[in-house]
Design a protein with these regions (language model features):
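Conserved alpha-helix/loop element of class I SAM-dependent methyltransferases that forms part
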Residues: 1-13, 28
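Class I SAM-dependent methyltransferase SAM/SAH-binding core
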Residues: 16-72
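A short acidic, Gly/Pro-enriched loop at the edge of an enzyme's catalytic core
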Residues: 71-83
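A short SAM/SAH-binding and catalytic strip from SAM-dependent methyltransferases
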Residues: 82-95
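A short glycine-rich, Lys/Arg-flanked "PGG" loop and its adjoining helix->strand segment in the class I
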Residues: 96-108
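Conserved class I S-adenosyl-L-methionine
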Residues: 113-135
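Short alpha-helix
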Residues: 145-159
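C-terminal helical/coil "lid" or tail adjacent to the Rossmann-like core of SAM-dependent
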Residues: 164-197
Length: 197
């Protein structure tokens, strides 16, 4: 709900979400979405779009679904009042091209809402794993170095005149080991090589 709340959606808005995944941003907030909006959900993966369409339902006329690369948005200039890139920009091969495209399709006064994380994200888990075996790396890619808390404003500055950072204040207490182990094993690093032997 936090990212959705930052969007401040009101009737009449034309919205584009880049990298919508399974549409969870919308399925979790569909009862709050005004009736007179137009939401274009996009993803590079047609499978993800299929999942989003299935989760939202085909009968909701507020939504359309399009597969495309966000470095080449197939819409006219000034088509959207709001563009959302929720944990997406750090996956983009050419972030500058994506920002240029977002700027192009936004209306004057339109907004980009994007999310990322920083260098200290989940640092306690990383430290725990390193203390167990210092060969383990939970992520082979440091995505925050591509677009993160520490450099995001500098990357966006050539394309957007006003940039604001809103921190999501949160903490997580994990009293049982099993969910933590499952999370660690699901990461994109080399942990399975050392932990599952």
């Amino acid at each position: 709900p936090w990212v959705y709340e930052q969007c401040q959606i009101h009737p009449g808005m034309r919205i584009l979400e880049l990298g919508c995944g399974d549409g969870v941003l919308w399925t979790q907030n569909i009862s709050s979405l005004p009736g007179k909006v137009s939401v274009t959900l996009s993803d590079l993966s047609s499978g993800m779009l299929r999942d989003a369409r299935r989760a939202i339902g085909r009968k909701d006329s507020r939504f359309s679904f399009e597969a495309f690369d966000c470095a080449r948005i197939p819409h006219e200039d000034r088509s959207f009042d709001l563009v959302i890139a929720n944990h997406v920009l750090f996956y983009c091969e050419d972030i500058s091209a994506v920002c240029s495209e977002i700027q192009r399709v936004l209306t004057p006064g339109g907004k980009l809402i994007c999310s990322t994380y920083g260098k200290k994200h989940m640092q306690e888990v990383s430290r725990l794993v390193r203390d167990f075996d210092d060969r383990i790396v939970l992520s082979a890619d440091k995505l925050y170095e591509r677009f993160g808390r520490e450099n995001g404003a500098d990357i966006l500055a050539p394309y957007f005149s006003r940039i604001f950072w809103e921190s999501y204040k949160d903490s997580l207490l994990v009293p049982d080991a099993e969910p933590l182990i499952s999370y660690i094993l699901s990461c994109h690093g080399n942990q399975n090589q050392y932990l599952l032997d």
